[in-house]
Each structure stands twice: as structure tokens, then as C-alpha cells.
């Protein structure tokens, strides 16, 4: 189970880095930011969730019959907001913003097939 969990985590990390949902569609793009002084649009080319896709923030927990991939610490809160498209404050005293749903964790067809193959290889079929 541990090997399957690690492989799934690696697949999730690559997908998050590529800015894609499990079905292959692209994430909803960031909202354009406005400069407070000039009131013009800022050009931001930074990737979303750049640090969130690192191994440090994605934990694999395994038992004899299951594997779980989850975000740890404060990263879990941030990931939950984006996974489900919830409302949150931009900063401590800022406005509340409705974030679009961006599916960070999920199974693609390739992931399901990979887990199936690993389980069959373990059982010996």
C-alpha cells in the first residue's frame, strides 16, 4: 500500500504543478490583480499552489489495507478552501472572497488504472 500511496502522491504533485484538475481540464485562472496606486492591472505569471505541491506539505498515511494522501498543517486549510470553492479572507483584516473550485486531490483514470495494476501485482494475478 505504501508504494501505491507514494506513486499516487507523485501523480497528484505533477498534476498540481501542471495546474490541472484530475479530468485534465485547466484550473480556473487567477483573478487579475489591480495595483492600488496606479489602478492598473498587474501582470502575474506565478503558478498557483507552487509550494503546496511539494512533498513537505503532502503526507501519505498507510495502513495494512488503505492509503491516504492529505495536506498537513495550515496547507490543509488552504487546500480545502480551493478544493471545494469556499469563502475565505484574503488576509487577517481583508475582505472575504469566494474562491472558485480547483480540484487539488482526486483520481484520474490513469491513477485508478495504476492502483488496480499495483494491487493485482501484489496479489499475484
Predicted regions located by residue number:
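C-terminal or internal capping secondary-structure element at the end of a domain, subdomain, or sheet
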Residues: 94-125
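Short, low-complexity, charged/polar segments at coil/turn and helix-coil boundaries
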Residues: 1-92
Amino acid at each position: 500500500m505504501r508504494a501505491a500511496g507514494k506513486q499516487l502522491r507523485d501523480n497528484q504533485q505533477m498534476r498540481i504543478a501542471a495546474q490541472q484538475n484530475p479530468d485534465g481540464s485547466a484550473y480556473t485562472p487567477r483573478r487579475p490583480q489591480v495595483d492600488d496606486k496606479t489602478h492598473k492591472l498587474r501582470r502575474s505569471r506565478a503558478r498557483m499552489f507552487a509550494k503546496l505541491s511539494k512533498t513537505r506539505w503532502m503526507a501519505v498515511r498507510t495502513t495494512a489495507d488503505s492509503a491516504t494522501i492529505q495536506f498537513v498543517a495550515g496547507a490543509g486549510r488552504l487546500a480545502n478552501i480551493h478544493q471545494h470553492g469556499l469563502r475565505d479572507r484574503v488576509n487577517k483584516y481583508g475582505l472575504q472572497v469566494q474562491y472558485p473550485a480547483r480540484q487539488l486531490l482526486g483520481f484520474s483514470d490513469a491513477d485508478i488504472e495504476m492502483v488496480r495494476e499495483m494491487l493485482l501485482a501484489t496479489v499475484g494475478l
